[in-house]
């Protein structure tokens, strides 16, 4: 925005995968709360929107897919502890967007989740919560995909499928 000061909020689409999806979701909530601007859309690719990756997690995908894959529940716990400045931070919806009680006024949202990903269920639950709050939301689970599949490049069928969803979403279909 600094190099394009004439950019209008309706031209902004936030996009992020994994922790980047966390940042995009948190920024959308913060933008609404501050009233400074609101992006038109957000695209969250296998987003990390929660703060609990223990065995007690509300989301079964943490237990089902939290071992023996690239992203494990143990790594997620480590990342959470590195990211949080304090235990209190972990309770903030700017840290874990799914904790936000009021999800009204959020941008149009596309959420893509991976079938074999500890983050799958929280991403899908976040989409349901956004929809229940009256937002326009699409959620698609990429079958047989692992967390991080976007790094495989455009030759990957999972990436191609994702780009189809993204293009349709951006075109407003």
Each language-model region and where it sits:
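Alpha/beta-hydrolase superfamily serine-hydrolase fold, recognizing
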Residues: 1-173
């Amino acid at each position: 925005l600094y190099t394009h000061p004439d950019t209008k909020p309706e031209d902004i689409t936030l996009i992020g995968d994994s922790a980047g999806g966390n940042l995009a979701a948190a920024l959308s909530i913060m933008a609404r709360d501050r009233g400074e601007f609101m992006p038109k859309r957000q695209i969250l690719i296998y987003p990390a929107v929660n703060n609990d990756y223990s065995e007690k997690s509300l989301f079964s995908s943490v237990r089902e897919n939290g071992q023996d894959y690239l992203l494990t529940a143990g790594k997620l716990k480590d990342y959470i502890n590195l990211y949080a400045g304090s235990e209190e931070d972990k309770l903030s919806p700017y840290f874990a967007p799914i904790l936000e009680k009021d999800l009204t006024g959020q941008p149009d949202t596309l959420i893509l989740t991976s079938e074999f990903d500890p983050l799958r269920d929280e991403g899908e639950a976040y989409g349901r919560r956004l929809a229940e709050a009256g937002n326009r939301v699409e959620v698609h689970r990429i079958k047989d995909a692992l967390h991080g599949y976007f790094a495989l490049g455009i030759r990957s069928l999972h990436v191609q499928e994702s780009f189809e969803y993204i293009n349709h979403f951006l075109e407003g279909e």
